[in-house]
Amino acid sequence: MREVTIAAIQMSCSRDVKENIEKAAKLIRAAAEAGAQIILPSELFERQYFCQERRYDYYDYAKPLSENDAVQSMKALAKELGVVIPVSFYEAGEGRQLFNSVAVIDADGEVLGIYRKTHIPDDHYYQEKFYFTPGNTGFKAFKTRYATIGVGICWDQWFPETVRGMALKGAEILFYPTAIGSEPILECDSMPHWRRCMTGHAACNLMPVVAANRIGTEEVVPCAENGNQSSALTFYGSSFITDATGEVVEQMDRVTEGFILHSFDLDELESERKSWGLFRDRRPEMYGEN
């Protein structure tokens, strides 16, 4: 029996980087005290979601791994608490390329590696192509102290190729740091669709999925640098954990800060995957290159 307890934290983000990092650390510490061993913060939690507007000066937010405040703070916290923390951050990579990345920090405080967001959205007030180069790491599985995990980032979660790619690499649990909320043009609530998409991924790959989203309304202040844009996004939280069949076993509401956690037996999950034969019966030679 290999039991692991996983958690997702949910919080609002202010314009104060230090305040956001301290808030995330406080929630991670509380989750660890409750027994969590792998703890997921939301996407780009250092700041408010700056991709809502286009400003050239925001490129300066990107830092190399070794210089990012959130990563360095979480490395120390992971070592202190003996927990795994996948940390989303704005990365200044090689060749002056800028990436939306996750550093997977193991329970000894060391970075196991980086995943760079593969699928980059470009929509009203989710203008990520302005800031991020599409990731070049490919889908990865990270062997942490407690489990082998896969990490996708927000828009990645809408693509079944992301999940299957991580599953084929050996992932046992899938983690998605997220920043998603109101649709500024479409008059719809995308939350149920967002959640169903990932519960389906869990069911089709027979492995738990964890999604951590932010909450709160974030407003853009009109100025010359953003062309006098005036807008706002309300992030709908609803962070959740599924079991291997896609059943939501833990969830949060749309407005509350805090964390959720759940325990799984990894040996039992592996046995269940084998008994269903989903990976045995794959026919990749029939799927084509596209």
What are these regions (language model features)?
Residues V87-F89, S101-V104, K140, S239-I241, ...:
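Short beta-strand scaffold segments in enzyme catalytic cores
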Residues K63-S66, A76, G93-T178, S182-G200, ...:
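Active-site catalytic loop in hydrolytic enzyme cores
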Residues V17, K26-D108, I114, I180-M207:
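Cys-nucleophile CN-hydrolase/nitrilase-fold catalytic domain and related Cys-dependent amidase chemistry
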Residues I6, V104-L112, T242-V249:
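Short, glycine-anchored, charge-dense loop/turn motifs used at functional sites
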Residues E53-Y61, D123-H124, A224-S230:
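Short glycine/proline- and charge-enriched loop/turn segments
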Residues S66-P86, C154-G258:
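CN hydrolase (nitrilase-like) catalytic-core segments centered on the catalytic cysteine
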Residues M1-I38, F175:
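N-terminal active-site segment of His-dependent metallophosphoesterases
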Residues D267-N290:
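A conserved C-terminal secondary-structure "cap"
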